[in-house]
Structures are given as structure tokens and as C-alpha cells.
């Protein structure tokens, strides 16, 4: 919010759970980029639905009622795809609703809601599916990873050669602006990554090196990690734990699965050519954490 103030951006504050505030925000809005969500890998499903699905529904109603909308961009996630190894998966593969945590399941449901509005209400919308979004001001994954790297608590799952699905925030913003500038993208879905294959080992090594931390030296066999994840999740749910176990399904997906997704469509239809490589983006990201005293 402070950054928006520095840029002189006019703000209309509200909540996705407060329809009246959404009506105020939607008044006169011709272009809308919806990137708000409850993010996490643990917690009651209804808490995710209240924001990611019902909140989205209230926002759609508000922008449609305003009557001036020209383009709505819904930021989804590559997490909507089935929780398995992926090798070049593209947008022709349907999202999955099985074996999902609350966040990814509600991202699937949110996409379904947007698509229904496209069909039934003629909503002028485009869906963008980024991978793991990283960059300066990250408040979700990297802060936790940096803490564990500093404490020497990170282990590879298997060989660590499984691929990541990184998306630098600046590259994502480029795609969003390109989508908004091209009405022909209405009704389309786009996978978005850096297009720069990086393994789990390469990712973690780069973060650790830039931060000045020791590289992880040990690994957990993939089968063992999967088994421990299943047991940990079941036990934590049985005990009603409020925090995710160290090994959750979402974390296993992040560290254990091969997450290679095709971005051929966004390259072809938008001429997308990522400006920032993974190493450039992560260097800028860790520099920001260092400047903020967060290392």
C-alpha cells in the first residue's frame, strides 16, 4: 500500500467479503485485474472459498453491474493442474479438483466461475495462470524458505533435478498489460512462466548463494518424502492443527514434483518473450530482502 502511495495511485479500499466496497471500487472501472486471494497450504476450506470464490463472485457482480467493463483479467495459478509430474503440460489439459489443498481447489472453482460468466453473462475476461510468483516484496514462500535455509533445515526431495515453474513478477506484469491491450485475448487462458527451465536444486542453490547461506547437503528419497507427507497431513488434520505440517501436499508439490508447463500459447498469441531470466529476477529479489534487512 505504501508503494501505491509513492506512485500516486488512487486507492479505493475494500474487502472481497464486503460487496458494498466492491461496488464503490467498480464504479467507472473499465479494466480490472483481479489478483487478490487467500494464499496458503492449510486451513478450513470455507475460509478459502469465502474469498477466492464467493468474493470473486461478488466482484464479478459489481463490475458487471457498473456497466462499463471492457476487460477483466483473472489471475489464476498453474496449481489448478493435477498434482503430478508435468512435462510440457499446456492449456488443453483440464484442471483437476482431486487431491487439492484449499488454495488450489478454490483457484479451480474460481476459474470455473469466471468461465461460467464468460459463457452466460458475456463477461469480457481472460484467465492467466502463472507458476510460482517470486520477486521483491514476496510475503509468502521465499521468506519461509530463507528462514529454513539460514537454519540449515532444507533438504532436497529425491535428486532435486525436477523442474520448477518460476514466474518473475515483472514478467507476469508484462503479460497482464499485453492481455489488456489485446481484446482478442478475451475468453482465452494462458500459462505463464519465465520460460527458463530451473531445477529444484538449481533454484534452492541460487537462493542460498545469493543470500550467503550454506547449500543444502542432504536429500530425502522421493518415496519417503511422499509417504511422510501423507502421514503428516492425516495426523495434523486428525489433531485439528492450525498450522501446516513441515511436509504438506503443497510443499511436496513445490519440492518434489516435476513442474514443466508449456508457454507456447502465450508466446504465439501475445509474442511473449520474458524480459527477465530466473537468475536476474532472483538476484533482484534477494537484493530487496537484503536492503530490507530480512536476511
What is each residue range found by the language model?
Residues 261-269, 273, 277-295:
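Amphipathic terminal alpha-helices
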Residues 169, 205, 228-238, 242-273:
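Conserved C-terminal active-site "lid" loop/helix of NAD(P)H-dependent oxidoreductases
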Residues 85-133, 154:
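Catalytic helix-loop patch of NAD(P)-dependent Rossmann-fold dehydrogenases
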Residues 94-97, 127, 147-167, 171, ...:
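A conserved pocket-lining segment of Rossmann-fold NAD(P)-dependent short-chain dehydrogenase/reductase
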Residues 179-247, 283-284:
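Mid/C-terminal beta-alpha module of Rossmann-like enzyme folds, strongest
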Residues 3-5, 9-54:
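NAD(P)H-binding glycine-rich loop region in Rossmannoid oxidoreductase-like domains
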Residues 108, 121-123, 134-144, 170, ...:
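Glycine/proline-rich active-site loop of Rossmann-fold NAD(P)-dependent oxidoreductases
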Residues 58-102:
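Conserved Rossmann-fold NAD(P)-dependent oxidoreductase catalytic core, especially the SDR/UDP-sugar
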Amino acid at each position: 500500500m505504501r508503494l501505491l502511495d509513492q506512485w500516486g495511485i488512487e486507492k479505493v479500499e475494500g474487502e472481497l467479503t464486503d460487496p458494498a466496497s466492491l461496488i464503490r471500487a467498480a464504479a467507472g472501472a473499465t479494466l480490472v485485474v483481479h489478483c487478490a486471494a487467500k494464499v496458503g497450504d492449510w486451513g478450513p476450506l470455507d475460509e478459502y472459498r469465502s474469498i477466492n470464490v464467493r468474493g470473486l463472485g461478488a466482484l464479478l457482480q459489481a463490475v458487471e453491474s457498473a456497466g462499463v467493463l471492457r476487460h477483466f483479467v483473472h489471475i489464476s495459478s498453474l496449481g489448478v493442474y493435477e498434482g503430478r509430474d508435468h512435462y510440457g503440460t499446456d492449456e488443453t489439459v483440464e484442471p483437476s479438483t482431486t487431491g487439492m489443498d484449499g488454495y488450489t481447489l478454490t483457484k479451480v472453482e474460481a476459474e470455473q466461475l469466471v468461465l461460467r460468466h464468460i459463457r452466460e453473462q458475456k463477461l469480457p475476461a481472460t484467465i492467466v495462470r502463472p507458476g510460482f510468483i517470486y520477486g521483491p516484496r514476496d510475503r509468502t514462500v521465499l521468506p519461509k524458505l530463507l528462514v529454513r535455509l539460514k537454519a540449515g533445515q532444507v533438504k532436497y526431495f529425491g535428486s532435486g533435478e525436477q523442474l520448477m515453474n518460476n514466474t518473475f513478477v515483472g514478467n507476469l506484469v508484462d503479460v497482464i498489460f499485453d492481455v489488456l491491450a489485446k481484446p482478442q485475448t478475451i475468453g482465452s487462458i494462458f500459462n505463464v512462466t519465465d520460460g527458463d527451465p530451473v531445477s529444484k536444486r538449481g533454484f534452492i542453490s541460487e537462493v542460498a548463494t545469493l543470500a550467503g547461506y550454506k547449500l543444502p547437503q542432504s536429500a530425502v528419497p522421493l518415496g519417503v518424502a511422499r509417504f511422510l507427507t501423507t502421514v503428516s497431513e492425516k495426523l495434523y488434520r486428525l489433531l485439528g492443527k492450525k498450522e501446516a505440517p513441515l511436509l504438506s501436499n503443497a510443499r511436496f508439490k513445490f519440492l518434489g514434483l516435476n513442474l514443466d508447463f508449456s508457454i507456447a500459447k502465450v508466446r504465439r498469441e501475445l509474442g511473449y518473450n520474458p524480459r527477465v531470466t530466473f537468475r536476474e529476477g532472483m538476484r533482484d529479489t534477494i537484493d530487496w530482502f537484503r536492503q530490507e534487512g530480512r536476511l
